[in-house]
Amino acid sequence: MNIQEAKEEIKRTVEAYHKRDEDGSYKIPVEKQRPLFLMGPPGIGKTAIVEQVAEELGINLISYTITHHTRQSAIGLPFISKKIYGEKEYSVTEYTMSEIVASVYEQIERTGIEEGILFLDEINAVSETLSPTMLQFLQYKTFGMHRVPEGFIIVTAGNPSEFNKSVRDFDIATLDRLRKIDIEEDFQSFKSYAYQAGVHGAITSYLEIKKDRFYFVKQDIEGKRYVTARSWEDLSKLLQVYEELQYPLEKELCQEYLADPEVAEDFTLYYSLYQKYREIYHVPDILEGAEIKETRLFLEAPFDEKLSLLSLLTDALQIAFTDYVKKKELLSRIFRFLKSMKEKLSEVSVSQALEEEIKRQRKRMATLKEARMLSKKEESIRLQLIQMFGDFYSALKERNSTEDTGNREDRKENEADFSLIKDCFRVKEEERQQEVEKTGKMLSNALNFLGNTFGEGQELLLFLSELTKSPYALGFLSDVGNETYSRYNQYLLLKDKQKALQEEAKEVLRS
């Protein structure tokens, strides 16, 4: 299966293993909760999808590369203790708690969350001395004498032997205790992830043109040459910062990420063209609905150049769609806070409630960060949330410093303060609605430009197809809708249906 299908399977498994019966016990007993074994080439995103599942489900994640561990660190250090058997004292060997198991308990203490995923990478490359320990662990979730807490699901990963000389094939006894998921590289599933992760448009459009360069590992007389999904994503992060700093992209830099001279040089050349297209095609003007006179330039452009234009349009819209999703979540959280605060107006002052909430949010964010459970998106939302609560608090202080509140009853003063906060929230919501309207117009302008310039051809079809691969775009369209999008989408669907019927009719006539 591809990486997105594997992610969905992991998510379903975690939810199934965590399902409890009416007595509070897990419906699937711990010893029957088979660990998942993700088998696939390096750099395709096995670790990334496990991180995404943990984030989406709001559970802990502990990750280890098992080949970095010795037998002692895995099962604990031995020590001598005294035991009495049959009224006679004996010296017996016991073990300290495994470093891995201890880290799970520490994570639970940090976050207060008792469920999670324990992810062990390179499990099929463990040393022979660790093999018996791993067999015991896979069946009973124990390292030495200590068990992993019940709420933790075991997910493991490994690479095929052609990618790692240390890999050993599991025997039947081990395989019979695992659920093996074979994962293959797939560019289309990577694209869905790329939109969510904000991968640079130059990379996605380049790979759309040259899909064979998305992932490969080759061996020749000069050594190994390889490019992976991880290579492209990491290069994207650097590329975005380089653009902010106005640094050029050199072939040598690309080759540090793309370990193939030919691909590194080719992408460097494409990126310079991509930047040139950004200047030529005036994407902001298209999205603002300005009249574009040089339509002949677009019509006569080669297909790869048209793909770059579509990518530039998608990139610009993607920023707006992402901002929409974040702002929606941000204001939803503020609304829930205001709703709960309204119910407690008789118990606590508005300013005190805001102070306590700011402290709580900061503490929670620090906890999540320390536990490595804070994604970039979540961190951004929480920082904005703290900033907005701070703005509300400042507005209260400013109002109360200029007004005489000494003669007001506490209850009325609290209601007046709450009314001010509601007004502040209303302003933020109105600003958000204006941005939603602007985003909708940008999308309509992009679609109308493509429709007027290229007609209902493959360019428009490709653009609509790319929108459906972005979870943020789908979120916007699902919540807000867009008349222009619906019109073009329905027309193309009808066109496809008519084409299919025509083909069917031809087949009938032939027979």
Stretch-by-stretch model annotation:
Residues 249-275, 281-284:
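Conserved helicase/translocase motor-coupling segment
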Residues 299-511:
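Terminal-proximal interaction/regulatory segments of ATP-powered molecular machines
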